[in-house]
């Protein structure tokens, strides 16, 4: 953090970094001097450094980085938020907002920078087909931009699984669980279609990037090798993590030995033999003759919080062995 402060922090409190630092190699972000994603990432770093200070009971460390976090947050909100577009945008060297909406504008959600009103306005773009609400969520460039391509063309419209993970985790920060689940399911459909295409002449694969409004991998005329196949770097995020955390709805904390389950609707689902710090657990919802019930099995004690349809919420200690609970009795 100190090195970043010394080399990239400017007098206005924001950070200036090369656009290449975002890895968005052909994104139309010309003249960017203050990238919104880099500054949001710095806020995230400061936030977690402060949290580590709390864990270590180091009050000076915690206060130092908490102050830095709020300093960055204030500057991002005051300088990088566009009231007309309801979007966070990059700045040029003169601190003018650049008129391009990219996926980088959603990094502030993950950093918990916008207030509830700004977050709601920003999140509306994710359901707007004219901007980021494409069939396959979420394109790396707004669909109303002149550089947007239905074929993806790198960061001119392609859907990158690793960017989707960032956006979906940002939605969680503001309790948009239903939208996060819906977008996860849609994203997983396109991942699965790319892995098992309907056309038998095609070989399936896990790709680096996908098309925004149709099935299949993205393409780029000037770079035939794009997107890379066998791209396992982000495959786990798009498949395993989103399935467990957003489709099923489980939030797991190994240090606290806790499992939170947000059940969006009553249906048969769950997970078997999930590792919880040397403790294999099984959690399943099923409908029996007695009604909807949750069946659980565990090797050791852990704490289970269940939130059903945002109407019932309860935390219970779950002992080792097998047990079940009727949802109506909670």
List each language-model region with its residue ranges.
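Structural helix-adjacent loops and short alpha-helical linkers that scaffold large soluble proteins
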Residues: 1, 51-70, 112-126, 171-184, ...
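Extended glycan-interaction surfaces of carbohydrate-active proteins
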Residues: 2-34, 74-159, 192-224, 242-244, ...
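Alpha-helical scaffold segments in carbohydrate-active enzymes
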Residues: 2-10, 41, 48-51, 55, ...
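Non-catalytic C-terminal accessory modules of carbohydrate-active enzymes
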Residues: 124-134, 139-142, 153, 169, ...
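Intrinsic-disorder/low-complexity regions
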Residues: 38, 57-59, 89, 202-204, ...
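Residue-level preference for long, well-ordered alpha-helices that form the structural scaffold
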Residues: 31, 38, 58-61, 65, ...
């Amino acid at each position: 953090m100190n090195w970043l402060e010394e080399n990239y922090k400017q007098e206005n409190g924001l950070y200036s970094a090369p656009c290449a630092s975002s890895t968005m190699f052909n994104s139309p972000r010309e003249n960017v001097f203050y990238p919104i994603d880099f500054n949001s990432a710095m806020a995230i770093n400061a936030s977690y450094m402060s949290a580590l200070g709390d864990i270590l009971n180091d009050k000076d460390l915690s206060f130092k980085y908490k102050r830095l976090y709020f300093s960055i947050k204030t500057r991002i909100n005051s300088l990088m938020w566009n009231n007309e577009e309801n979007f966070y945008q990059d700045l040029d060297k003169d601190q003018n907002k650049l008129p391009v909406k990219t996926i980088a504008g959603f990094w502030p959600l993950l950093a918990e920078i916008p207030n509830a009103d700004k977050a709601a306005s920003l999140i509306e773009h994710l359901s707007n087909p004219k901007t980021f609400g494409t069939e396959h969520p979420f394109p790396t460039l707004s669909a109303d931009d002149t550089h947007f391509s239905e074929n993806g063309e790198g960061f001119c419209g392609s859907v990158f699984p690793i960017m989707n993970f960032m956006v979906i985790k940002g939605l969680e920060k503001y309790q948009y669980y239903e939208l996060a689940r819906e977008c996860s399911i849609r994203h997983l459909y396109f991942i699965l279609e790319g892995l098992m295409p309907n056309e038998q002449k095609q070989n399936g694969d896990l790709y680096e990037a996908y098309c925004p409004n149709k099935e299949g991998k993205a393409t780029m005329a000037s770079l035939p090798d794009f997107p890379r196949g066998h791209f396992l770097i982000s495959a786990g995020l798009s498949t395993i993590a989103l399935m467990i955390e957003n489709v099923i709805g489980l939030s797991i904390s190994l240090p606290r030995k806790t499992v939170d389950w947000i059940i969006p609707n009553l249906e048969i689902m769950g997970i078997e033999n999930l590792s919880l710090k040397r403790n294999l657990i099984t959690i399943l919802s099923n409908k029996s003759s007695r009604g909807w019930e949750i069946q659980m099995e565990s090797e050791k004690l852990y704490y289970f919080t269940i939130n059903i349809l945002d109407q019932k919420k309860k935390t219970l200690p779950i002992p080792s062995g097998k047990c079940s609970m009727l949802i109506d009795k909670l």
